[in-house]
Amino acid sequence: MAQAAAAPADNTKKLWGGRFTGKTDPLMEKFNESLPFDKRLWAEDIKGSQAYAKALAKAGILAHDEAVTIVEGLAKVAEEWKAGAFVIKAGDEDIHTANERRLTELVGAVGGKLHTGRSRNDQVATDYRLWLVGQVEVMRSEVGELMRVAADRSEAEVEVLMPGFTHLQNAMTVRWSHWLMSHAAAWQRDDMRLRDLLPRVATLPLGSGALAGNPFLVDRQFIAKELGFGGGVCPNSMDAVSDRDFVIETVFAASLLCVHLSRWAEDLIIYSSGPFGYVQCSDAYATGSSLMPQKKNPDALELIRGKGGRVQGNLMGVMAVLKGTPTTYNKDFQECWELLFDTVDTVHDVVRIATGVLSTLRIKPDRMKAGLSADMLATDLAEYLVRKGVPFRETHHHSGAAVKMAEDRGCTLFDLTVDDLKTIHPLFTDDVAAVWDFNRSAEMRDTEGGTSKRSVLEQVQKMRTYLAAEGQH
């Protein structure tokens, strides 16, 4: 049996219903509403409305007692949300209409004065900015904790050597801690990006009205201070209601953070695989196979890698929504919010899971050491001749000849004698034996940012100094 169509909604009871006589198609009601996802902004919407009520009183539009009644009424609405007692009713199109409807039920007609000079265009932008400031600060604390775990492990495990790769081919000897700090350096840049975008997020649109400004001379600087918007006020009312740069910037920063975490996860997925066996995820962050009893799959890492694609998709989605929209507010903008919510929620989960994986990860130094091979010292062999005055371009050729000699003989560089090497260049002498030392190879890279023990510990200390300076001990 076909389901009966819902009755059309009465537009005359809506906040915007004054010029309407017809009713809204029920499907359009559902299509248009945003309350199912924007109700999570109830606290920010109430906070913004309380600040606006105070500004109206300051401008002489509300009497003092009216402003107090509205502010206290909004506090009661907030208590209902906190207690899970707020009742959503038909016609509550979004969080703004829901809160205003309930306020008017509680305080009477004076509640209808709250929206004086205000549009949902400047209200919604304010709510999202206010919410996003808090979320970015939480993201920063989560990334900071991940960086702290990386720094602590790097210091504790600084003696561990492992193969370094380029093109996923054997390259040079590095410290495990150097590899880990390479990712922490990327996370630090991510944190800086989040920090740097905060002032642009924390810029106040409220007081811009629908597009042309507020005719009641509300003090926008006062509102910005009330709401803690350190970026001041949006300088142009048309831009204020149309600007969604803060969404794109945040989703981009989140997307790049997820790219970095995806690359980190990919490395660990490779390092945990059978042929490598350098690391093993704890049981808390791995799963098994329904068929193969021996399997321990790095699902947490694979999901981190996969969710990076999801967040990148959100970035493309937001940009596609905004492209081609005419100046000032358009309903298209509503489509940005779910993408923003999903991005923020995903990043919170991804960073926390990454921190859990890293803090419980088991490393296998013996397997890492076993992965070191003689060919990874070929560059050191070239540098040996450099120190004897031979130009590097020549030494590179001579070292390559040694590698080829070993390959042709089916042996390693270690197996070549001094006499063998002398046939390549006469400056090879008995002291070349010192080259065949993986720890020495790492220690020779002692410049700032290098893989020597001193340099890696310096990187750790610099990261801790950064975290302390940013208040992320």
UniProtKB/Swiss-Prot annotation:
GO biological process, one term: L-arginine biosynthetic process
Any one GO MF annotation of this record: argininosuccinate lyase activity
Coiled-coil annotated spans: none
Residues flagged as site, Increases basicity of active site His: 302
Pathway: Amino-acid biosynthesis; L-arginine biosynthesis; L-arginine from L-ornithine and carbamoyl phosphate: step 3/3
Active site residues per record: 167, 289
Keywords: Amino-acid biosynthesis, Arginine biosynthesis, Lyase
Alphabetical list of Pfam families matching this protein: ASL_C2, Lyase_1
Reaction(s) this enzyme catalyzes, per UniProt: 2-(N(omega)-L-arginino)succinate = fumarate + L-arginine
EC number: 4.3.2.1
Gene3D superfamilies (UniProt xref): Fumarase/aspartase (C-terminal domain), Fumarase/aspartase (Central domain), Fumarase/aspartase (N-terminal domain)
NCBIfam families: argH
Note from the entry: Often used in tagging mutagenesis schemes to generate new mutants.
Name of the protein: Argininosuccinate lyase
Organism, as annotated: Chlamydomonas reinhardtii (Chlamydomonas smithii)
UniProt gene name: ARG7
